[in-house]
Every structure is written in structure tokens, then in C-alpha cells.
């Protein structure tokens, strides 16, 4: 989906993710061998603000990558050739661009730094004709998701306000999307892959989503976002980048900055105190700004 990408090598790192794999000698050795066979000149390691690049840097060094750069709070020893230190308060996208620039990869003068994807397919066969608003209710971390009943109420409120609504979700979320869509919205749960989802999001007037991948994919295809943003990570670093965005949710809630996967507060107040009316008004505001 990304222009300029020639090959994708996927490896599950044992220091990342919600359920990282065990450390296996053969698995680590296999990665080092595959990278060494690629004879790569340079490696840019991109991590979020609370992650260390040094485990990856060690493996890349062992794979004989010529030059390695990353943003690192920790002293890298001989693991990094370029150690960048991010400026305080930078959005994650900007921090990544800064790190790339420190390694010599500077955007072209006309490049605004926004994520780009290859043109997605036409998806009118999925969405039907006419304008619509997308509601994406799921998230990999439950703390970042609006409760299903709230999503369903918002879908009904959007429909009552005259909007056609399309609900999206992955194959494991079909029960959720069916509940949220109800009888008033088009349910695309489990019916899109990443490319067709990009097409659905690109053609939407507005996307309503928590802090999860489709919100950032919507930004990549230029669609405004109503971001139901749990403050477990800071919105100024992680909100959708480069498009008109309205952030809803109590950013000063007790869970702020906790990085919690599950909400530590009874009733999930940071998000569930957001009302369907709040969402409708936010959608209408973004629509007004875009006309």
C-alpha cells in the first residue's frame, strides 16, 4: 500500500506487542540471516516515545547493516551510527520524520510529511452510492475503544440527523459491527482488507474512530476524523496527523498517560462520557469546514 516500498519483511519481535513471542535462538538467527542476505546499506529504526530501538539495532548490527540510526534515550554504545533525540512535544509522525532527516533522508521540498498510500480501489460496491460517514468501533486495546452501546447510539443519532452511516471492522469484529450498525447502517464488518478499507475511508465524508489503525489510515487518504481518544497515550503525539481532526474524550482523566490496555477506571468515563450528540456536532462541524 505504501509508495516506494519494494519489499516487506515481517518478524514478530519478542520485545513488542501485547503478547510477544518467546525468544527462540533459531528464530533470531533466521532474522539475522535474512537481513544479512539483503546486504542493506542503511537501517532507520522507528519506535514510539516509550520504546527502545536498541534490541533491533543489536540484531541489525549482527546482520552487518552498514549504517543504523534511531531515536534513543539510552546510550547506544556502538549499536547506532546516528543517535537522534526528539524534541519535546513532537507528534510521533514528526518525530519519525526528524529521525529520518538526521540519518540523511530529507523529504522532497513539496512533500508535506503526511503518510501516503497507493490509490485504493473503488469501493462503491461495498458502500453503495451517495455520501456517508464511517464509524469504526473497534480497537486492539479495549481502553482505546468507545463502548459498543455508545457507538450504536451514535450511529442511530447520525442516521437521525440525516447521515448515511457505514460501520467498519475486521474479521474478528463482525459481532461488534453488527451490534453497532443495527438496522440503520451498512455493516462492512469482516468485508474489507487493508486496501479496500482505505478506499472506504477515502470516499467517506468523515470517519469516527478511536485511537486505532483506521483513524490513521483515514488521515493518510485525506479524510477528516472525529477521534474518540482515550488519554492513555497523549493525543498531541498520537492523534491523526495532517487532516482536520476533532478530539473527543477527557484528556485529563485519571488514566491519562498510563498506557493502560484495559481501562483502570470504572465506567470508562474518559470516553463513555462523550455523548452521541457530541459526535453528531463534531461530524457536522467537520463537514461545514470542508465545504
Q: What would you call each of these model-derived segments?
A:
Residues 1-291:
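Catalytic machinery of carbohydrate-active enzymes
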